[in-house]
């Protein structure tokens, strides 16, 4: 309860979104942010080993205690469907929960897509605000029985935070982000159409935490790519 907890669930994009959110919070709030996820656990700039996307309940609580003692005010974490189904995050009062997408995966554990989606939807009974990718129709499944206030992001008319004038390039994406009458431009050095969704979710989380749209876009534009996620490798002698 003494930490601002941000949880991100979905089949793909969790690692990228959590890393981008950590960067934006550090740049805009000057906060010390803990990170829990697939690639690494991190307290500020200190890297800790990781065994699974979301630790077991006892280990998770110990890690959160360690982050609090180290001066963290915010924690952004990947929340896997296994963790939700096995109640590893029960009792954690998430300030914000976010949904990236839902595609076929982990059916050895969940057996059906319905059970898989229902497991991920549990996050939105544990958070105050839900930031959801409205470009994936499964966002409606996430909101069934939800206890949170939803904030939809995407490229369609249903999105409260919407990407317009999207430009896709080999080494970046650029877009105008509109929220009602407000608009801001962002250029992010991670290529791929999915980067649009990841960027919007990051900005939606920032907005849910009270960070201004322009400030969030400016901070996001300074983010580097995520290790092992669509890293651009220059080839000498070729454009």
Where do the protein language model's features map onto the residues?
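Adenine nucleotide phosphate-binding catalytic loops in nucleotide-utilizing enzymes
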Residues: 110-117, 144, 148-239
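Phosphate-binding loop of NTP-binding sites
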Residues: 1-134, 138-149, 179-182, 206-209, ...
